[in-house]
Amino acid sequence: RTRAEIESMYWSICREVNSMAKTMKHMPDELRGLDKMLADKYFCNFSLFQSLPDAWAIDQLFPIVPIQRLDERPTRNATLQDITCDSDGKIANFVTNRQASHVLPVHSIKKNEEYYLGVFLVGAYQEILGDMHNLFGDTNAVHISVKDDTYHIDQIFDGETVEEVLDYVQYNPK
């Protein structure tokens, strides 16, 4: 019990120091990693190795943003984890406000809420590299064009079903 209380105090102090550090004109180097250390881990329903292999292999940055609750300012910071068997897929480098960051601004997740993030500028190259890693299959994809202040959904591509993915590896559950 005492250890849990001390750990709770430690994290509270870290959050307070981080909050104060953000107001400093010149932040000490020792405090620069607090944002990353305090970031939430958001587990996402995808495989990093399949969907964004260049983010894993060469640390390529892809624009990632929440695509809902756009009228609310994000109040949390997070890193992203995939849900593969080892949860080895982690994104901890992001583009925010035209600069690199170790955390992604996100909203607190509400009870029973499905929270969606969009990953942009991925393209077919990433899909070809990712192939069938972890048997996730192809994900749904959308082509959108933007002109002036409006957008148009040009095409919607359905992802693969579990049955289709299992068929690739000659598995027939019947």
Where are these regions (language model features)?
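Charged (often Lys/Glu-rich) extended helix/loop segments that serve as interaction or gating elements
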Residues: R1-K174
